[in-house]
Curated annotation (Swiss-Prot):
SMART domains: CYCc, S_TKc
Residues that bind ATP: 792-800, 813, 1370-1378, 1391
Pfam assignment, any one: Guanylate_cyc
CDD domains registered for this protein in UniProt: CHD, STKc_MAP3K-like
Comp. bias intervals (Low complexity): 1054-1093
Stated name of the protein: Putative serine/threonine-protein kinase/receptor R831
Span of domain Protein kinase: 786-1049, 1364-1615
Provenance organism: Acanthamoeba polyphaga mimivirus
Catalyzed reaction equations: L-seryl-[protein] + ATP = O-phospho-L-seryl-[protein] + ADP + H(+); L-threonyl-[protein] + ATP = O-phospho-L-threonyl-[protein] + ADP + H(+)
Keywords, comma-separated and alphabetical: ATP-binding, Glycoprotein, Kinase, Membrane, Nucleotide-binding, Receptor, Repeat, Serine/threonine-protein kinase, Signal, Transferase, Transmembrane, Transmembrane helix
Membrane topology of this protein: Single-pass type I membrane protein
Family matches, as InterPro entries: A/G_cyclase, Kinase-like_dom_sf, Nucleotide_cyclase, Prot_kinase_dom, Protein_kinase_ATP_BS, Ser-Thr/Tyr_kinase_cat_dom, Ser/Thr_kinase_AS, Ser/Thr_Kinases-Pseudokinases
Length: 1624
C-alpha cells in the first residue's frame, strides 16, 4: 500500500512542478517554492542570504508536509525535496533536479545517565537495524554494550522509546527507511511486508513507540521531552544542543570504519558517487556510501524544476537558475551553510551540477545566458585575482585551490572547466586527454624566507649546503659558523637563536617543487628526504613547525621569530608585515643571486630559449610556471570555450591583468618573446567543432598578432601603412606603389566629384545642426535647461542642488565661479569631457555639464539615499547587518578600482563622497576636476586650503614630495572601512590640527575596540590596518581590496550574504536565519528595490496595519518653557522622549516616521497601535511616569510645569504638561527608503491631530469612534461635540478618567457626567441618545500657542525660512555658507550649515544654545536674531555687517588704517571676546581669526561665529578646513583647553592687524601646526611699539596659564591707546 502511496505522491508533486512553471510571469518576478518541513530551514537561510544579491524578485517559500505540497499547484516555480526523484520520472515530466546541499541524519537519544560523560554511543549498521525492527528494545542490550564497552554498567536497563514518522518516500523519513533496509536485511524484509510503513511494522504496536511529527524539529522536540527516547533528526537541528541528556550516535560505516557526522564525512559520501554525477546521473542516494570516511546516513537536498516549458516571459526561471548557480559558486553561501550544518556539495561535483543549468529551456531557447566557469589548481594569488577582475555580468568564475595534479585529474572526469598547474603536467594525462593543451600564463619564484628581527632591512645569503643542513637538523642556530661565513657584513647581527623550520604538513605543490630542487642539487637531501609532496622532517629536525593550511606557511613565518622555510615570492609579498619576513639570496658558484624580477625574468628566458642556467650567473634557480590546462578541441560547451579563450588573452594583454601580475611579482608569459608565440599559437588552435573560439584567432600568424605590424579589430588585421596581407605579413614594395599610383590617378578625379557633392551636403547638415542648437559634445547643455531645486549639500568647490533636467531628477553641482578664469573654463571643459565618458555601476554617472561661467555646473544622477556618512550616523537605523556593510565596502572599492584603472585618482575619498541610490548601491562621487579644484584652491586664502583632515593620508599631510595618490586613496578607504565597522565619526572631538599632528607624529588612527574585533572577522580588521598603514608599500591596491572583501563574504559577482555567527551578533542575517528556523509558516523574502537590504533592519520595524488606533502626544506651553530655562527644557524634552518611546514599545505601539519637513523629538509624537486598549493603557502609564519623573528643579518653578495638588494633597501635576488624543480608523502607510521607518497619514491621523489641539495638558481625549470600541473597558466623561474637518458630522469627544488621576480638573469646559450621582463612570448609549451632550467652544480656555502642535516651534527666535529672502553668497566657512538676505525688511546674514542632518539630540541642544545666544547683548558681538531648524534649511540668522570681515578690511588697498584706528579695532574685538568669556556660562569662541571679526560701516567691530561648538565640529568633518594659523598649541596637541586658547588666537590677530599680512603665509597645514608646537611665531616688526609687542607675545605664549585673560588684554590695549594718544 505504501509503495502505491509513495508513487502517487511523487507523481502529484511532479505534476505540481509540471503545471506550475508554464504560466506567464508577472511584471516583477515572484518566485514561489515549497519543500519538506525538514528542508525548510535550509531554504530559508539560502533565500535570506541570496536576497542581498538579487534585488528584482520576491522569493516566497513554504515548508510543508509532503501531502500538503499538493495543494500548491498554482504557485510552484520549484520544489525542494529531501531526496532525488528517479530518472524515469525526470523523463516523463521533463524535469531537471539539482543537488543543492548535503545533510547528515543522526540517531538522537535522551539518556540522563550519560549526561556528564564526554562520549557518544557508538552503533553499527546491523545493530541499528535491529533496534528499528524491535529485536533490540533496551539500552543495555548486549549488542549495544559490545559496541560500547566503556559504558557497561552505565547504559540503563530501560526500554528504548522509538519516535518514528511516515512522511513519504522523498522525505527524510523515506531516506531513513531506505538506509535501514540497506543496513539490515531483516529490516528490509519486514518493512516491505508492512507496506513500506513504519506504522505497520511490529515494533510500532508497542507502547514505547510513538508516531511523531513529519519535521526534524518536531522529532527533536519530542526527544528533548522524553527520557530514554531515540529518533532520527537532521544534524543541523541538534548540533547546537545544550541539553546534557541529549546526544547523537557515532556509527560504523559500510567500510567498517567509525565515523561521526561532519562536513567532511558527508562530502566524502557525496564524492563516493562522483562518477555517477559526472555522467549526469543525479537520481541516486548517498546513504550507506562505500567510502572509508563516509557518513552512512548522508543525504542530499534537491531542487526540482521543469526543463522544458513555454512562456511569454522566461525571467522567473532565470532567477531560479541564478539562485541555484549562486548556491554552487558563492563562498558566503558555503560558509553560512556549513556553520549551520548544511554541507555544500563537494567542490568536485559543482561543475557537473552547474552544467545542468543549460539544459533548462524556455520556448526552445536556453534560459541561462550566463557562463559559469569552475576551475581548480595550485595555490596562487594571481589566478583568483584575475578571475575576480575578469568576472562580468555574463561570466562568473570560481577557483578552488588544490594540488595541481588533482585539478588535472578533475579535468579528465569533467569535474572542472579548466585546470591550473604550477608544477607541470604528468605524461599520463596526455594519454587520458588526447587533445590536452597547456598554456603558460605567468611565472613566479620560490624563495627561502626567514623572520629574523635583528637583520630587518639587511640581506641574508644562504647556499644549498646550508639550506639542506638546516632541513636535516645539522645546522640549528642562526649564528652557526657556516651562516656567519656566508654573511660577513652582518655576522655580528645574527642572533644566537634556534632556527624554527616551517613546513606544510599536507600534500602541496610548493613542497614538491622545493624538495625536487634540493634533491637535484644535493645528493644527501635526495637520499634522506627526496622529492615529495609532504616531507616528514620530524626524524631529522626537532625544531619544526608544521602547517596544515595550504596557504598558511607565511602566517607561521610572521608569527614565529627566527623561523625559516621555502615559500612563494608572491606569498611573502602578500604578508601584512613585509619588513619582518624577508627573502634570502642564494650563493651559487661564487655568485650571489637575489630573488627579484630580473633574476626571475632571466630564469624564464633561459628556459624558453633552452639555455643552460649555468651560462647566466644572474638566474634565480627555483621558479615555477603557472599554466592553464584544457582540452584544445573537445570542449563540450562553445560558450564556455569562448569565455576561457577570452580569459587567456585577457591575462596576457589587458592592462589591468598586467598591472596586477607585476604588482604581485609575477613574470607574464607574454613578456617573453618565445612564450608569447606559444601563447598565441595555442590560442589560435583552441577550437570548438573545428572553429576557433578566440576572437583574435584570425589575426594570429606565426606566433604574433598581425605580424606585429597591425591591430586586430573585429577578428581582422588592420595593417600599418607599410604592410599588407591578411596578417600584415607582406611588405608593400615599389612595384605595388606604382600600381597604387595608377589606381589612384583613375579614382581620385571621380572621388573629387563625389567629394564636392558630399561637402555640400555636409555644409547643409552642419547649418541645420547649428540652428538646432546642438554640438558635437552631446553632454554640453545650456544652464537654462535645468530646474534648480533645494540644496543637497555644500563642498569646498560649490553647492549641490536637487534639480530637474528633461523631466528626470538629477543632482547639479554648481562650481563656485567667483574666481573662474578662461583657463579654468578650458580645463573644466576638458576634464568634464573625460568624466562624462566614464561608465560604471559603482561610480556616480556624469550626465551633462554647462561649461560657461558664471553657471559652470555638472549634472549627475540623483542619489536618493544620500551619503554613506549620513547613513552610518542615522540614529533611526539601529543596526546595519555585517553583510550589508561588506557589500557597501565592496561596491565602493569596485568603483575606486575602476577610477584608478581609468587613470583617475580621487584625492578626496571619504564617506561623504560615497553615495547610495534607491536600491542601496554605493557609488563613488566628487572625483575628477583636479585642475579646476587646484586652481580654485590657489585663489583661496590659507584659511581654506586643505580637504577634510580625517581621511587624508599622512604623506599628504606631511607635504611629501613624492606622493602616490592611488595609495593615498587606499588610506582614505581604510578610514571608511573603520567607519563601517564602528558607525562612529573618526577622531570625534578632535580639532583638524590635533588630528594631523597625531596622525603624523604619533601614528594615531581611529581606535578599534575589542568588541569590534570580536564582532567582525579578523580579515576585515587586518584589511583596515593595512589600508591605513603609514608605509605605503603595505597598503593593498583596490583590486586586492576587492578580492579580500570578496573572500570575506562571497564572490565579487555575488557580493552578499552571511558570515560567522560572531560576525552577525550585532544583527542582520544571523538573526534572520534563527528567526526563520523557528517558523513553520510562509517565509516571504522581498527583493524589490530596498527591502532585502534591510533583512537585519526590518525586523525592528513591525508596524500596525489595517484599522489602527492613532495617539497624538504633545507638550503644551513648550515655547514658554524653552524661553524660561533652555538647558532645563533641553534635558526635560530628552527625558520626555525617552519615557514616551519606552512605554510605546512596552505596549506594542509604533512611532510614526516624521515627514522630511519636520524634526523628531520636538515635543509631539504620532503613535500607532493595533490594539485600542493597549493604546489607552500606554497613555495612562505615560501620564503616571511623567508625573513621577525627575524633572530639573528650575523647570518645576515655572507655572507651566509646577507641582499641583488636589484637595486631598494628592499630587496630580508635576513637570511637563502633556496632552494626549486618540482616534481609530484606516490610514495610509508609506516607508522611508533609508530608515525603513513607516509614516502614517490620511484623515484618521489628521483628525487625531486636530483633537489634540483641543486638549489640555495632562488630559487624555478619545474620539467617538474609539469610545464606541472600548467604552466598557474604561471610565469616560463626555466633553462635548465639535466640528472636525474630514469628519462627516459633529464628533463627540470623551475624556478618559483614571483612578489615580481622577481629580485632575481642566477649566473652561462643562462636563456632562452620565453616571448620575457618581463622580465617574462609563458613558452608555442611552445617555448619548438623551440629548444631554452639549456643543462647546472647546478653545475657550486653551492658550493661543497651544492651539497648534509642537508649540516649541513658536519660540520667538525660531524663524520660518520662507520668510527670508536669500541674496548672494558672501562667505564660505569651515561649517557653512553665508548669504546676505532680508527678513521682515531687515538686512540679515544667513549662515547655512553644511550638515543638514542633525540628530534629535543635536537639534535639542541647538535649540538650547539658540535660546541662550538670543539673550546675549553687547555692542561688540554680532546680534543673534534667530535660527531656522527645519532641514534642508537649518541656519542661523544674524545682523548683517556691510564692510565684511576684518580680513577684507585689512586687504582693501583703498582703506588706509592708522595705528590708532588699528588699536580701536583691536580694542573693540577684545571687548567682544571678553564679554563672551564673562558670560554665564562662559563661551569659548574656539575660532578667533579676522574672518570671524566683522566690521560695520562705522568701523565698529563685532565678534561673529561663536557658539554651536558641537555642530561646528560635525560640520568641519564634512568640509575642507583651513590651516591652524590662529590655533593654540594645546588645541593642536588635542589636549583639554580653556578660554586662554582664544587669547592665543587674539595674539595672532593683533600681529595680523599690526602688519596687514597673513600669518604663516605660503606654509602648508602640517608645517604651520608643527611650527606652532615648536614655538614658531610670526616675526614682529622692529618698529612695533614695545608694549604692543610685549602684549602680543604674552597672548601667544606657549603655556596657557602664562597668557593674560581677555579682561587684562582689554586693560592693556586701553593703556597702550592712551599712551599712543598722549604721544601723538
Amino acid at each position: 500500500m505504501h509503495s502505491v502511496y509513495t508513487k502517487y505522491t511523487i507523481i502529484l508533486i511532479l505534476l505540481v512542478i509540471y503545471q506550475g512553471l508554464p504560466t506567464n510571469t508577472q511584471v516583477a518576478s515572484r518566485i514561489f517554492g515549497v519543500g519538506s518541513k525538514s528542508s525548510g530551514p535550509l531554504y530559508r537561510q539560502l533565500i535570506d542570504i541570496y536576497s542581498y544579491t538579487y534585488d528584482n524578485a520576491v522569493f516566497i517559500f513554504e515548508d510543508l508536509p509532503i501531502d500538503v505540497i499538493l495543494t500548491q499547484v498554482d504557485y510552484i516555480d520549484y520544489v525542494g525535496l529531501d531526496r532525488c526523484i528517479s530518472h524515469e520520472y525526470e523523463e516523463i515530466f521533463n524535469l531537471v533536479q539539482f543537488p543543492l546541499a548535503g545533510q547528515a541524519i543522526v540517531m538522537t537519544y535522551n539518556i540522563p545517565e550519560l549526561a556528564n560523560l564526554d562520549t557518544r554511543i557508538v552503533i553499527d549498521r546491523q545493530t541499528l537495524g535491529k533496534i528499528w525492527t524491535g529485536e533490540i528494545s533496551k539500552w543495555n542490550h548486549p549488542d549495544i554494550i559490545a559496541l560500547n564497552p566503556t559504558l557497561n554498567g552505565t547504559l540503563p536497563d530501560k526500554e528504548i522509546k522509538l519516535g518514528y514518522n511516515d512522511d513519504g518516500n522523498v522525505s527524510i523519513s523515506g531516506i531513513v527507511q531506505a538506509a535501514l533496509s540497506s543496513f539490515y536485511g531483516n529490516f528490509a524484509t519486514e518493512f516491505n511486508n508492512a507496506g513500506q510503513l513504519f506504522a505497520n511494522m511490529s515494533f510500532a504496536n508497542e507502547s514505547r513507540c510513538v508516531n511523531i511529527g513529519p519535521s526534524s524539529r518536531e522529532r527533536f522536540d519530542w526527544v528533548k521531552n522524553t527520557t530514554y527516547s531515540l529518533t532520527f533528526v537532521n544534524y543541523a537541528d541538534v548540533f547546537n544542543n545544550t541539553n546534557p541528556n541529549i546526544s547523537v550516535m557515532n556509527m560504523y560505516n559500510k567500510a567498517g570504519n567509525l565515523v561521526e557526522p561532519s562536513l567532511e564525512s558527508v562530502q566524502f559520501a557525496m564524492a563516493d558517487f562522483k562518477d555517477e554525477y559526472s555522467n549526469n546521473n543525479f537520481a541516486l542516494d548517498v546513504f550507506d556510501a562505500p567510502g572509508n570516511n563516509s557518513w552512512p546516513l548522508s543525504y542530499v537536498n534537491y531542487i526540482v524544476m521543469s526543463k522544458r516549458f513555454f512562456q511569454l516571459d522566461c525571467s522567473r526561471a532565470d532567477v531560479v537558475l541564478k539562485f541555484i548557480a549562486w548556491v554552487y559558486t558563492n563562498t558566503a553561501a558555503s560558509k553560512a551553510l556549513t556553520q549551520n550544518q548544511f554541507y555544500p556539495l563537494d567542490n568536485t561535483l559543482k561543475k557537473v551540477s552547474i552544467d545542468n543549468i543549460y539544459i533548462v529551456k524556455c520556448n526552445n531557447v536556453s534560459v541561462s545566458e550566463q557562463q559559469y566557469l569552475i576551475s581548480f589548481g595550485g595555490s596562487t594569488s594571481i589566478v583568483p585575482s584575475w578571475l575576480t577582475a575578469f568576472t562580468s555580468g555574463s561570466i562568473v568564475a570560481k577557483y578552488y585551490s588544490t594540488l595541481s595534479s588533482n585539478s588535472i585529474e578533475l579535468l579528465t572526469t569533467h569535474g572542472c572547466d579548466f585546470a591550473v598547474t604550477i608544477n607541470g603536467v604528468d605524461q599520463k594525462f596526455y594519454q587520458e586527454i588526447e587533445d590536452l593543451a597547456v598554456m603558460p600564463l605567468a611565472a613566479f619564484s620560490i624563495v627561502p624566507a626567514y623572520n629574523i628581527p635583528e637583520i630587518v632591512g639587511k640581506t641574508l645569503v644562504l647556499d644549498i649546503d646550508v639550506i639542506v643542513k638546516i632541513y636535516l637538523g645539522e645546522i640549528t642556530n642562526w649564528n652557526d659558523t657556516k651562516i656567519r661565513n656566508l654573511n660577513p657584513e652582518i655576522s655580528n647581527y645574527l642572533p644566537n637563536a634556534i632556527i624554527n623550520v616551517v613546513v606544510q604538513n599536507i600534500e602541496s605543490d610548493i613542497n614538491q617543487i622545493f624538495t625536487k630542487f634540493l634533491s637535484q642539487e644535493s645528493e644527501i637531501f635526495s637520499q634522506e628526504i627526496g622529492q615529495t609532496y609532504n616531507p616528514d622532517l620530524s626524524l631529522f629536525n626537532s625544531s619544526v613547525i608544521f602547517v596544515d593550511d595550504i596557504d598558511g606557511l607565511g602566517d607561521e613565518l610572521i608569527d614565529n621569530k627566527y623561523s625559516f622555510g621555502f615559500w612563494t615570492d608572491f606569498g611573502v609579498r602578500l604578508l601584512s608585515r613585509v619588513q619582518t619576513v624577508q627573502m634570502a639570496s642564494l650563493k651559487i658558484n661564487d655568485d650571489i643571486i637575489e630573488p627579484n624580477y630580473d633574476t626571475l625574468k632571466n630564469a624564464i628566458s633561459s628556459e624558453s630559449n633552452q639555455i643552460a642556467r649555468s651560462t647566466n650567473s644572474n638566474v634565480w634557480p627555483i621558479t615555477s610556471m603557472i599554466s592553464i590546462v584544457y582540452p584544445e578541441t573537445t570542449m563540450k560547451n562553445k560558450d564556455k570555450a569562448v569565455a576561457i579563450a577570452e580569459f587567456m588573452y585577457w591575462t596576457q594583454y589587458d592592462p589591468l591583468a598586467i598591472n596586477s601580475a607585476n604588482n604581485k611579482g609575477y613574470y607574464l608569459a607574454s613578456s617573453d618573446p618565445q612564450l608569447r608565440s606559444v601563447v598565441l599559437d595555442l590560442l589560435k588552435n583552441f577550437k570548438f567543432e573545428d572553429e576557433s573560439v578566440s576572437s583574435y584567432a584570425n589575426c594570429i600568424y606565426q606566433g604574433s598578432i598581425c605580424s606585429n605590424f597591425g591591430t586586430c579589430i573585429e577578428s581582422a588585421c588592420i595593417c600599418n601603412s607599410s604592410r599588407t596581407g591578411t596578417y600584415c605579413e607582406k611588405i608593400i614594395t615599389d612595384s605595388e606603389n606604382n600600381t597604387l599610383i595608377i589606381i589612384l590617378a583613375t579614382v581620385i578625379p571621380i572621388a573629387c566629384i563625389f567629394g564636392l557633392l558630399l561637402l555640400t551636403l555636409l555644409i547643409v547638415i552642419i547649418f541645420l545642426l547649428k540652428h538646432r542648437n546642438t554640438t558635437n559634445n552631446d553632454w554640453e547643455i545650456d544652464f537654462s535647461e535645468l530646474e534648480i531645486g533645494e540644496t543637497l549639500g555644500t563642498g569646498g568647490y560649490g553647492e549641490v542642488y536637487k534639480s530637474i533636467w528633461k523631466g528626470t531628477e538629477v543632482a547639479v553641482k554648481l562650481i563656485s565661479s567667483k574666481h573662474v578664469s578662461k583657463d579654468m573654463e578650458r580645463s573644466f571643459f576638458e576634464e568634464v569631457k573625460i568624466m562624462t565618458s566614464l561608465r560604471h555601476p559603482n561610480v556616480v554617472l556624469f550626465m551633462a555639464a554647462s561649461t560657461k561661467s558664471p553657471n559652470m555646473c555638472i549634472v549627475m544622477e540623483f542619489m536618493s539615499l544620500g551619503s554613506l556618512y549620513d547613513l552610518l550616523g542615522n540614529e533611526l537605523i539601529p543596526e546595519i547587518p555585517y553583510a550589508l556593510k561588506i557589500k557597501m565596502a565592496y561596491q565602493a572599492s569596485k568603483g575606486m578600482h575602476f577610477l584608478h584603472s581609468s587613470g583617475i585618482v580621487h584625492r578626496d575619498l571619504k564617506s561623504l563622497n560615497l553615495l547610495l541610490d534607491s536600491k542601496w548601491n554605493v557609488k563613488v562621487s566628487d572625483f575628477g576636476l583636479t585642475k579646476v579644484k587646484s586652481e580654485l584652491d590657489k585663489k583661496k586664502t590659507n584659511d581654506n586650503i586643505i580637504g577634510t583632515i580625517h581621511w587624508i593620508a599622512p604623506e599628504i599631510l606631511n607635504d611629501s614630495t613624492e606622493v602616490d595618490y592611488i595609495l593615498a586613496d587606499v588610506y582614505s578607504f581604510g578610514i571608511i572601512l573603520w567607519e563601517l565597522l564602528t558607525r562612529e565619526q573618526p577622531y570625534k572631538g578632535m580639532t583638524p590640527a590635533a588630528i594631523a599632528v597625531s596622525v603624523i607624529r604619533d601614528g594615531m588612527r581611529p581606535p578599534i575596540s575589542d568588541e569590534a574585533v570580536t564582532a567582525h572577522s579578523i580579515e576585515y580588521i587586518d584589511l583596515i590596518k593595512q589600508c591605513w598603514h603609514s608605509d605605503t608599500i603595505i597598503r593593498p591596491t583596490f583590486l586586492e581590496i576587492m578580492t579580500r572583501l570578496s573572500n570575506i563574504l562571497g564572490d565579487s559577482s555575488n557580493m552578499t550574504s552571511g558570515t560567522s555567527s560572531s560576525s552577525l551578533s550585532s544583527g542582520g542575517i544571523g538573526k534572520s536565519i534563527t528567526d526563520s528556523k523557528s517558523s513553520n509558516s510562509r517565509s516571504s523574502v522581498e527583493s524589490s528595490n530596498t527591502s532585502n537590504t534591510f533583512r537585519g533592519i526590518d525586523r525592528h520595524n513591525s508596524h500596525p496595519t489595517g484599522e489602527v488606533t492613532v495617539a497624538f502626544i504633545d507638550i503644551i506651553s513648550a515655547s514658554k518653557l524653552w524661553e524660561y530655562d533652555p538647558d532645563g527644557m533641553c534635558e526635560s524634552t530628552k527625558m520626555y522622549n525617552e519615557i514616551i518611546r519606552r512605554v510605546t514599545k512596552k505596549y506594542g505601539g509604533y512611532e510614526s516616521f516624521i515627514s522630511k519637513d519636520r524634526n523628531s523629538g520636538e515635543g509631539s509624537f504620532c503613535l500607532v497601535f493595533s490594539d485600542a486598549i493597549q493604546a489607552i493603557n500606554s497613555c495612562e502609564e505615560m501620564q503616571l511616569q511623567l508625573l513621577n519623573a525627575n524633572w530639573p528643579k528650575k523647570i518645576l518653578q515655572h507655572p507651566a510645569a509646577a507641582e499641583e495638588f488636589d484637595r486631598t494633597d494628592q499630587l496630580i501635576f508635576r513637570g511637563l504638561r502633556v496632552r494626549m488624543a486618540l482616534h481609530c480608523g484606516s490610514v495610509k502607510i508609506s516607508q522611508d527608503p533609508m530608515t525603513r521607518k513607516y509614516q502614517y497619514s490620511g484623515s484618521t491621523v489628521n483628525i487625531t491631530g486636530k483633537i489634540t489641539t483641543l486638549t489640555h495638558g495632562g488630559q487624555i481625549i478619545v474620539s467617538e469612534n474609539l469610545y464606541q470600541k472600548v467604552n466598557n473597558d474604561f471610565t469616560f466623561i463626555t466633553v462635548g461635540k465639535i466640528d472636525i474637518p474630514d469628519y462627516p458630522s459633529k464628533m463627540t469627544l470623551y475624556e478618559i478618567k483614571f483612578e489615580i488621576l481622577k481629580n485632575r480638573f481642566f477649566g473652561g469646559i462643562t462636563y456632562v457626567n452620565y453616571n448620575d450621582d457618581t463622580d465617574s463612570g462609563t458613558a452608555d448609549d442611552s445617555n448619548y441618545d438623551s440629548g444631554k451632550i452639549i456643543d462647546i467652544d472647546y478653545m475657550a480656555d486653551i492658550d493661543k500657542e497651544d492651539s497648534f502642535l509642537t508649540s516649541a516651534n513658536m519660540c520667538r527666535w525660531i524663524i520660518n525660512y520662507d520668510e527670508i529672502s536669500i541674496g548672494k553668497q558672501i562667505g564660505l566657512g569651515s561649517y557653512g555658507i553665508v548669504f546676505n538676505g532680508k527678513w521682515k525688511g531687515v538686512d540679515v546674514a544667513v549662515k547655512k550649515f553644511v550638515k543638514q542632518k542633525l540628530s534629535e539630540t543635536q537639534l535639542l541642544e541647538f535649540r538650547a544654545e539658540m535660546a541662550f545666544l538670543s539673550e546675549l547683548k553687547h555692542s561688540n558681538i554680532v546680534t543673534f536674531i534667530g535660527a531656522c531648524i527645519k532641514k534642508p534649511n537649518i541656519c542661523i540668522v544674524t545682523e548683517y555687517m556691510r564692510m565684511g570681515n576684518l580680513r577684507d578690511v585689512l586687504k582693501n588697498p583703498d582703506i588706509k588704517i592708522t595705528f590708532a584706528n588699528k588699536l580701536k579695532l583691536l580694542y573693540g574685538a577684545a571687548m567682544g571676546i571678553d564679554y563672551l568669556h564673562s558670560s554665564n556660562p562662559m563661551i569659548v569662541h574656539r575660532d578667533i581669526k579676522p574672518a570671524n571679526i566683522l566690521v560695520d560701516e562705522h568701523f565698529n567691530v563685532k565678534i561673529a561665529d561663536f557658539g554651536f561648538a558641537r555642530i561646528k565640529e560635525d560640520n568641519t568633518t564634512m568640509t575642507r578646513c583651513g590651516t591652524p594659523c590662529w590655533t593654540a598649541p594645546e588645541v593642536i596637541r588635542g589636549e583639554k583647553y580653556c578660554e586662554k586658547a582664544d587669547v592665543f588666537s587674539f595674539g595672532v590677530v593683533m600681529w595680523e592687524v599690526l602688519t596687514g599680512k597673513e600669518p604663516f603665509a605660503e606654509c602648508n597645514f602640517m608645517k604651520v601646526s608643527l611650527d606652532i608646537l615648536e614655538g614658531g611665531r610670526p616675526i614682529i616688526p622692529s618698529d612695533c611699539p614695545h608694549e604692543f609687542a610685549k602684549l602680543i607675545k604674552k597672548c601667544w605664549h606657549a603655556k596657557a596659564h602664562k597668557r593674560p585673560t581677555m579682561t587684562e588684554v582689554v586693560q592693556q590695549l586701553m593703556l597702550i591707546t592712551e599712551q599712543f594718544d598722549h604721544k601723538v
